[in-house]
């Protein structure tokens, strides 16, 4: 099952935008993702929804952060996260794609900085693969703003992800040996910038139950879409769920 990297970004922003100190919420939801890989149908996957904001650390979905410095306007933290992007040839309908090597999800470690203003929050982060699957790293720059309309909160976000050459080539490149097995042309992917937009809605029911839905859209650059593994130039993600706020 392939889960797009943008789901991670989509998850993290709404929790960061609405969390308060020492707030814990746990829930479950479903994520729908249009995979850019050829031979995949749309994916729907059950997911946990986890958020915790403490004085020294936080959990924002797949990211654990250890706060190094925090003030009214700035937060700097070390991060450990799980990168869910993967490719499983046995889960693909295309014969040529079935001949390719598996690309594994991986663990990442890095740093994240948040800057808060009245008009919104800016996030800048970078994280490297620590399991030596891709030997690459990923960066992110985004801005988001929470708007309150009665009990409903809306959080639009705009951002860009950066994949270095090693990361891009691991997930989207095709080696010479893979090319001979599959008949697909060999391809060496370059570093890539992936812009995205998202909108998150949260609505509390009573004191503890919170309904959440998020939609995200990303435009894939030619460094990715030129790969014979890819058959679309955009990706859409939708997440919905319910959580219990303690």
Swiss-Prot record:
<protein>
    <recommendedName>
        <fullName>Putative outer membrane protein YiaT</fullName>
    </recommendedName>
</protein>
<keyword id="KW-0998">Cell outer membrane</keyword>
<dbReference type="GO" id="GO:0009279">
    <property type="term" value="C:cell outer membrane"/>
</dbReference>
<feature type="signal peptide">
    <location>
        <begin position="1"/>
        <end position="21"/>
    </location>
</feature>
<keyword id="KW-0472">Membrane</keyword>
<comment type="similarity">
    <text>Belongs to the MipA/OmpV family.</text>
</comment>
<dbReference type="Pfam" id="PF06629">
    <property type="entry name" value="MipA"/>
</dbReference>
<dbReference type="InterPro" id="IPR010583">
    <property type="entry name" value="MipA"/>
</dbReference>
<keyword id="KW-0732">Signal</keyword>
<dbReference type="GO" id="GO:0009252">
    <property type="term" value="P:peptidoglycan biosynthetic process"/>
</dbReference>
């Amino acid at each position: 099952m392939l889960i797009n990297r943008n789901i991670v970004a989509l998850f993290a922003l709404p929790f960061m935008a609405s969390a308060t100190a020492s707030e814990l919420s746990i829930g479950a939801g479903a994520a729908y993702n249009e995979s850019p890989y050829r031979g995949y149908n749309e994916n729907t996957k059950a997911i946990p929804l986890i958020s915790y904001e403490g004085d020294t650390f936080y959990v924002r979905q797949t990211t654990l952060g250890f706060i190094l410095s925090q003030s009214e306007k700035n937060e700097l933290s070390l991060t450990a996260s799980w990168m869910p992007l993967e490719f499983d040839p046995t889960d693909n309908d295309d014969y040529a794609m079935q001949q390719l090597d598996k690309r594994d999800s991986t663990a990442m470690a890095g740093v994240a900085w948040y800057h808060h203003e009245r008009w919104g929050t800016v996030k800048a982060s970078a994280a490297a693969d620590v399991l030596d699957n891709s030997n690459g790293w990923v960066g992110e720059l985004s801005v988001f703003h929470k708007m309150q309309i009665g009990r409903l909160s809306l959080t639009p976000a705009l951002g860009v992800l950066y994949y270095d050459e090693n990361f891009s080539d691991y997930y989207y490149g095709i080696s010479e040996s893979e090319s001979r097995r599959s008949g697909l042309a060999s391809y060496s992917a370059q570093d890539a910038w992936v812009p995205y937009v998202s909108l998150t809605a949260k609505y509390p029911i009573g004191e503890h139950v919170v309904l959440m839905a998020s939609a995200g859209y990303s435009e894939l650059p030619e460094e990715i879409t030129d790969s014979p593994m890819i058959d679309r130039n955009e990706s859409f993600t939708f997440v919905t769920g319910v959580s219990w706020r303690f």
